[in-house]
Amino acid sequence: MKAAIIGAGNMGGAIARGLAKGTIIPAGNIIVSNPTQGKLDKLKAEFPALQVTNDNQEAAAGADMIIFAVKPWLMEPVIKELEL
């Protein structure tokens, strides 16, 4: 199973860390996208197997599960930009 997490703020980062520490989805099968590179770098430093990107479409492509961890007012534009 491959998981994409859109957003690496407090919520998205916590979800990514929890999944990466778990055994259900290998960390290498988790991709996190965020517009701020610093948050992605921090996650990658903690869990080197995590995949990170600034491109939401890249993160969502091929994912079996997409977790949206963005502010409510950003949800619609983020979903619209994805070609699902």
Map each language-model feature to its residues.
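NAD(P)+-binding Rossmann beta1-loop-alpha1 motif at the extreme N-terminus of oxidoreductases
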Residues: M1-F47, Q51-N54, E58-A61
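Rossmann-fold NAD(P) dinucleotide-binding segment
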Residues: Q51-L84
